[in-house]
From Swiss-Prot:
InterPro entries from the UniProt entry: 4pyrrol_synth_GluRdtase (IPR000343), 4pyrrol_synth_GluRdtase_dimer (IPR015896), 4pyrrol_synth_GluRdtase_N (IPR015895), GluRdtase_CS (IPR018214), GluRdtase_dimer_dom_sf (IPR036453), GluRdtase_N_sf (IPR036343), NAD(P)-bd_dom_sf (IPR036291), Shikm_DH/Glu-tRNA_Rdtase (IPR006151)
Active site, renumbered: 50
Site features described as Important for activity, chain residue numbers: 99
Protein's UniProt name: Glutamyl-tRNA reductase
Amino acid sequence: MHLAVVGLSHRTAPVAVREKLSIPEQQVEAAIQQLKSYPHIEEVAILSTCNRLEIYCVTRATEPGVREITQFLSEHSHLPLGELRPHLFVLLHQDAVMHLMRVAAGLDSLVLGEGQILSQVKTMYKLGQQYEGVGRILNRLLKQAVTAGKRVRTETSIGTGAVSISSAAVELAQLKVIARDDRSDGNLAGQRVLILGAGKMSRLLVQHLIAKGADTIQILNRTLGRAEELAKQYGGDLQIQVGLLSGLMNAIVEADIVFTSTSATDPILDRAKLEMVLAPEQRLMLIDIAVPRNVAADVVELTSVESYNVDDLREVVAQNQESRRKLAEEAEALLEEEVDAFDNWWQSLDTVPTINCLRDKIEMIREQELEKALSRLGTEFGDKHQAVVEALTRGIVNKILHDPMVQLRSQQDIEARRRAVDALQMLFNLDPQGQLSS
C-alpha cells in the first residue's frame, strides 16, 4: 500500500481556481464513494477549506492512484486537466505525512499558527470515518495529525495571539478605512457594518469588529436562529440587528462595509444587483472571505465599490508572519517526532503477515497435539477437564509468543526488524506470502 496526497492551496492556486475545487460538507459522502470506486484507491479522506482542497489516500499503486484522483478533481471542477495540473501538488508517503502534520499545526496556513485548521482536520477525520473512507492506515495517520496539532498548540506559543482569516479581514477593513477617509485612529465607530452568514467565521468577525470599535452591526442569515444567537452572545450594550438574507439588497443600501461568509456555492452579490440599489454617490466596501466566493468578480467594474477576497488578506498577514517564524521552527521539531512515530508504526506493518503466519502455524500445532492427547485419554475425560486443558495450552502458546511479538513490533531500527522477520521465517519455515495468496 502507498500513501499520497493530491491537492491545491493558497500557495498554488488563486481563489478563482480554489472555489471550483471546493467540496462542501454535504457533498463529501458522494465524493468519498466515487473516489473509493476507483480500482487503485483503498482509503480516502478529504480536507476542504477556504484556502485548500486536499485528498489524502491509500493506494494499491501510486501512479495510477494519483491519476485517478487527478481525473476526479478535473471532473468535479469542470477544469480540463491541462488547466488544472499547474495548480496541483502531489506528495508521497513521508512527504505526505509531514505535510498533513504541518497543516494540522497551522504551519501551512495563510495565517501562520491559526487554530481553525485543526478543527477542520478533525472534521475531515470524522467524515472520513462516518462515510467509510478511512481504514486502518488513514485512521492512524489522522489520529497522529490531530495529536501533532494539539502538541504544537500546547507545547509552543505559536497559537498565542495568532490572527485568523476573520481578524485579518477586519484589519484589512480598518486599513482601507484609514486610507480612504484619511483617519489616523483606525476606529471603526460610525461605519455601518453588514455581515452575511452566521457561522464560525462570522462569529469571529463580530468579536474583532467590536474590538475595533464598530458600533453599528447587522447580521443576515438564511435562518434567524443562529443570527439571533450570535447577536445575543456578543451584543452586550451594542444592539446588533439581525435579519434574513432575503432582505439583503435593502440592507446593502444602509451599509458602508459588507463582510460575506455564507456557504452559498454561487455568488449572491454581483454588479447587476448592486447597480439596481446603490446610489451613484454611495461608497461600499465588500470583503468576501467565503470560498466559493459570495461576491462576483464583476463588482470591481463599479467605481464606487471596493471589493476584496481572501487572497487580498496577504498584505495584512505578512506583518504577522515574521514574528512567528521562530515559533514555527520549534513546532517543526515536534512534528518530526510525530512523523517518526507514524513511520515506525507504518514500517511495523511489514511484520504483521509474519506474526499472523507464526500464530496460525503454532495454533494448528496446538490443536493437532491437543486432539491427539484427548483421544488417548478417552471418553472418561470429561468436558470440564477438556476445557481446563484447552485453556492451559492456549495460555502456554500466548505466553511463549508474547515477548517475541512485542519486541518485533516495537523494534524501531528498520534493518534490525527486517533481519528479525527473516530469522523468524527461516527458523519456523514460514511463508507469509504463500498464506496470503491462499
